[in-house]
């Protein structure tokens, strides 16, 4: 039998959200506002923590790095999505699609590991407050940050290593606004049952286990707060509550997408928007609105900028 000739697709067509021109313009303006807010909010956190010496603590060091990840994470999908709103045909090259998958999972995986590091930071702060600065020293903080990035890199490489050998000979239509593993895998011209199982294990099952472990960790921390004084307990409880909100905002949509990733649902795009576009914008708002120290530091930074201009 002669081998069947297959042509590898050179690009994918993204269906996006709507084919109506008026709605496309409205969505462009809406998501442009969201993206600009995301950039400004996360940059504000990074600048404030960098220039305010009162925030040079392990918790804010980690928060600054999380803001950097959020900024980069939104940049993986949002600029391409905004450009596509202005074009009738939305395409992405095969290489661009693979690059988007790599950086999407690098930063997404890094976020998951970062949230774990921040949970550990809060545990040390509550359980051993007198030794907190000694334990969470600069060397350990930098090591934990590097470990989070390495964890995200390993997770991303695994995703890419499973997809790159696959043949894509058509169709090439992705029912989404960006490239991700579940949608791309459906287009492969071969049986992907084993890969689907591996992807669910690497993403879906891992996300569920990690989410439960983080919830248990914060429950333990909140229980430990009972032994603290009123003011310190309220401040620590507020910080932990903020972390739980952020963890839930990130993990719940991911569980929805990656636990049943190869069966398309009507809500897939809306859920994808929630954690690829909305969460990076909401994170800095949540951390600043519930954090008196951060708000005070931003006011000091604003006053300094006004004085410098005068």
Swiss-Prot record:
It is a multi-pass membrane protein. InterPro entries: GPCR_Rhodpsn, GPCR_Rhodpsn_7TM, Olfact_rcpt, Olfactory_Receptors. It is found in: Cell membrane. Its main location: membrane. Disulfide bonds join 97-189. Glycans are attached at residue 5. The chain crosses the membrane at residues 26-49, 58-79, 101-120, 140-158, 196-219, 236-258, 270-289. One of its GO terms (biological process) is sensory perception of smell. Residues 1-25, 80-100, 159-195, 259-269 are extracellular. GO terms for cellular component: membrane; plasma membrane. Odorant receptor. This is Olfactory receptor 4D1.
């Amino acid at each position: 039998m002669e081998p069947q000739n297959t042509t590898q697709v050179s690009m994918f067509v993204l269906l996006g959200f709507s084919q109506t021109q008026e709605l496309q313009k409205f969505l462009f303006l809406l998501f442009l506002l969201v993206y600009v807010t995301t950039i400004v909010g996360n940059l504000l956190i990074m600048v404030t923590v960098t220039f305010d010496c009162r925030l040079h603590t392990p918790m804010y060091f980690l928060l600054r790095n999380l803001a950097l990840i959020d900024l980069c994470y939104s940049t993986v999908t949002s600029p391409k999505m905004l450009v596509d709103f202005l074009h009738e045909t939305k395409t992405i090259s095969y290489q661009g699609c693979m690059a988007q998958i790599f950086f999407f999972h690098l930063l997404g995986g890094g976020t998951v590991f970062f949230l774990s590091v921040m949970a550990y930071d809060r545990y040390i702060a509550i359980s051993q407050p007198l030794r907190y600065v000694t334990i969470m020293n600069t060397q350990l903080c930098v090591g934990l940050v590097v470990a989070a990035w390495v964890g995200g890199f390993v997770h991303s490489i695994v995703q890419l290593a499973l997809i790159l050998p696959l043949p894509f000979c058509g169709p090439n239509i992705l029912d989404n606004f960006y490239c991700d593993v579940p949608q791309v895998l459906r287009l492969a011209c071969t049986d992907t049952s084993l890969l689907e199982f591996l992807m669910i294990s690497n993403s879906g099952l891992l996300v569920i286990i990690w989410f439960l472990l983080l919830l248990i960790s914060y429950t333990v921390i909140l229980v430990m707060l009972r032994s603290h004084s009123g003011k310190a307990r309220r401040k620590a409880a507020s910080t932990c509550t903020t972390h739980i909100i952020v963890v839930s905002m990130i993990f719940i949509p991911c569980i929805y997408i990656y636990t049943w990733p190869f069966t398309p649902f009507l809500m897939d795009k809306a859920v994808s928007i929630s954690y690829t576009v909305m969460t990076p914008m909401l994170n800095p708002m949540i951390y600043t609105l519930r954090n008196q120290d951060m708000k005070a530091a931003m006011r000091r930074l604003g006053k300094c900028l006004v004085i410098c201009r005068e």
